[in-house]
Amino acid sequence: MPLNELQSVVPTRTLGLRENWSQFTLLVLVNAFVGGMVGIERTVLPLLAGAEFGLASHLATLHFIVSFGLVKAITNLFAGGISERIGRKRTLIAGWLSGLPVPLIIMFAPDWSWVVFANVLLGINQGLCWSTTVIMKIDLVGPTRRGLAMGLNEAAGYLAVALAALGAGYLAAVTSLRPEPFWLGIIFVLAGLLISVFFVHETKDFVALEVHQHHRATSTTFQPETFTRV
């Protein structure tokens, strides 16, 4: 980023967890919704596979791992580059848009191939949203709190996986395997999308600020006068 743009960022941005607690908290919440989407599927899909599609639960689990895991891994690989090109917020929104049809597809899937396709979309959703929330938190807190940012992100995501799995399992037990448990998914994806669109802010400026501060600290430490005094 040019120097004049860097200077324009400095007065309006401050690095730190405390300084950016509201945005950081929103991103923790968004990542919890990301984790919740996975929790629902992990609980209900193996049961749904056997009860409605005649598949063994271990085969359904294998399909889930392959279709979801492979796509998520590939998406994770490119998420950082995508967020650099189009921005963190747009990448996050794109991830939620890819996950938007997932609960509906599973609710009304006429055969198992539709469920596999939903898992592919979920893998894209997870790869883009989870990775981007990590990047955005690191942007906000700066170099001294990156470990804490990562820890809070992972804790929120996996706690949500567990709670959503528990909630979806309970709904499946007291109602039916579908559509009731997947109403949770609709709530999660809509909440994540709306928060990302209307409340989450772009964080790339914080990277520019960190670079500016690093350059300023370096230039202050290594002044030319240091050598002339020797």
PLM region spans:
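Cytoplasmic helix-loop-helix junction between adjacent transmembrane helices
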Residues: 118-158
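Short hydrophobic/alpha-helical segments at membrane-entry points of transmembrane helices
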Residues: 27, 113-119
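Flexible cytoplasmic inter-helical loops of multi-pass small-molecule transporters
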Residues: 2-8, 200-227
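Helix-loop boundary and gating motifs at the non-cytosolic
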Residues: 18-69
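C-terminal ends and interior cores of transmembrane alpha-helices
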Residues: 97-110
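Residue-level signature of mid-helix packing/kink "hotspots" within the transmembrane helices
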Residues: 68-77, 162
